[in-house]
């Protein structure tokens, strides 16, 4: 029986860890084997994700763990390309790539920006490495030739910030919009291939370390709102959002290039 391959970036915590778990849990074919390739900065975090996956199903196997700083573009290109070269693609009938990694950036008014070197580093993490990893994957799939007919789904971890601007969130919003539009263009380049689909999945407001960072760094005007979300239990469990996304990926029944939001799907 052909296997599923799931590649996940930012897999050491938060939504990345959750999607690695849920893509295993949500497979409608419980007897199908699933191989996972996981990337993140923290190797310890990746090992924790690997251990959690192996307790979920004996059919799931983490075949590669890669500690990788996504702001180091030459290293991203070298390591990601090497990993792709070592995958036995002929074993898989379904390929899932969750391009999930990213940072919050600095929250603040544009007139107050000063650390432009760090902004450039965050841009490389959030956008340049996103382009590199996506491009290398589709290039590899093209190299496999017409005989390769697996179902492919590439998912961008998106946000409401990709389609709506918020004050003091200019850097994060613009990076999310960039990623969404990049994937929309990718979907058009492959529109004639109904087995190749691209999804911008808006995760919802998750109860993660990034949300803790938001509460610490947001403006005083916004702080009560974000603290209230936490105190009132309105933050979403990452695994709940990841299960919605996983079911979408397995169904393959969505319009390629679309932006779909957790809040519209969890009904």
Curated annotation (Swiss-Prot):
Temperature dependence: Optimum temperature is 30 degrees Celsius.
Enzyme class: oxidoreductase
Subcellular location: Cytoplasm
Means of activity regulation: Inhibited by N-acetylserotonin and to a lesser extent by melatonin.
GO cellular component, one term: cytoplasm
Principal cellular location given in the protein's record: cytoplasm
pH dependence: Optimum pH is 5.5.
Entry-linked CDD domains: SPR-like_SDR_c (cd05367)
Binding site for substrate: 159-160, 172, 204, 261
Keyword field: Cytoplasm, NADP, Oxidoreductase
InterPro entries according to UniProt: Biopterin_syn/organic_redct, NAD(P)-bd_dom_sf, SDR_fam, Sepiapterin_red
Tagged with keyword DNA repair: no
GO BP annotations listed: pteridine-containing compound biosynthetic process; response to Gram-negative bacterium; response to oxidative stress; tetrahydrobiopterin biosynthetic process
Catalyses which reaction(s): L-erythro-7,8-dihydrobiopterin + NADP(+) = L-sepiapterin + NADPH + H(+); (6R)-L-erythro-5,6,7,8-tetrahydrobiopterin + 2 NADP(+) = 6-pyruvoyl-5,6,7,8-tetrahydropterin + 2 NADPH + 2 H(+)
Listed Gene3D superfamilies: NAD(P)-binding Rossmann-like Domain
GO function terms (MF aspect): sepiapterin reductase (NADP+) activity
EC number annotated for this UniProt entry: 1.1.1.153
Domain of life: Eukaryota
Disruption-associated phenotype: Mutant cells produce about 3% of tetrahydropteridines when compared to wild-type production. They display retarded growth, poor spore viability, impaired mitochondrial function, and increased susceptibility to oxidative stress induced by hydroxylamine or cumene-hydroperoxide. In another mutant, it was found 18% of BH4 and 0.6% of DH4 production of the wild-type level.
Binding site for NADP(+): 10-16, 41-42, 69-70, 176, 206-211
Cited function: Catalyzes the production of D-threo-tetrahydrobiopterin (tetrahydrodictyopterin or DH4), also known as dictyopterin, and in a much smaller amount that of it's stereoisomer L-erythro-tetrahydrobiopterin ((6R)-L-erythro-5,6,7,8-tetrahydrobiopterin or BH4). Prefers 1-oxo-2-D-hydroxypropyl-tetrahydropterin to 6-pyruvoyltetrahydropterin (6-pyruvoyl-5,6,7,8-tetrahydropterin) as a substrate, thereby maintaining dominant production of DH4 over BH4 in sufficient supply of an aldose reductase-like enzyme. DH4 represents more than 95% of the total tetrahydrobiopterin production.
Family: Belongs to the sepiapterin reductase family.
Descriptive protein name: Sepiapterin reductase
Organism of origin: Dictyostelium discoideum
């Amino acid at each position: 029986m052909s296997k599923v391959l799931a590649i996940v970036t930012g897999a050491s915590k938060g939504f990345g860890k959750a999607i690695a778990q849920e893509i295993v849990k949500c497979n409608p074919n419980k007897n199908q084997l699933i191989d996972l390739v996981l990337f993140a900065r923290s190797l310890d975090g990746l090992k924790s994700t690997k251990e959690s996956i192996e307790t979920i199903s004996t059919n799931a196997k983490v075949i590669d763990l890669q500690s990788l700083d996504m702001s180091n573009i030459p290293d991203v290109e070298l390591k990601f390309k090497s990993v792709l070269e070592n995958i036995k693609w002929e074993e898989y009938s379904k390929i899932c790539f969750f391009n999930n990694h990213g940072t919050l950036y600095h929250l603040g008014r544009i007139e107050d920006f000063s650390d432009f070197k760090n902004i450039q580093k965050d841009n490389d993490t959030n956008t340049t490495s996103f382009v590199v990893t996506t491009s290398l994957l589709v290039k590899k799939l093209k190299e496999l030739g017409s005989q390769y007919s697996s179902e492919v789904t590439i998912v961008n971890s998106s946000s409401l910030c990709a389609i709506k601007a918020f004050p003091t969130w200019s850097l994060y919003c613009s990076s999310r919009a960039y990623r969404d539009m990049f994937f929309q263009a990718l979907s058009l380049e492959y529109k004639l291939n109904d087995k190749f689909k691209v999804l911008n999945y808006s995760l919802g407001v998750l109860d993660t370390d990034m949300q803790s960072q938001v509460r610490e760094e947001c403006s005083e005007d916004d702080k009560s709102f974000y603290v209230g979300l936490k105190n009132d239990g309105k933050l979403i469990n990452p695994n709940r959002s990841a299960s919605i996304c996983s079911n979408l990926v397995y169904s393959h029944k969505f319009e390629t290039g679309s932006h779909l939001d957790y809040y519209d799907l969890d009904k």
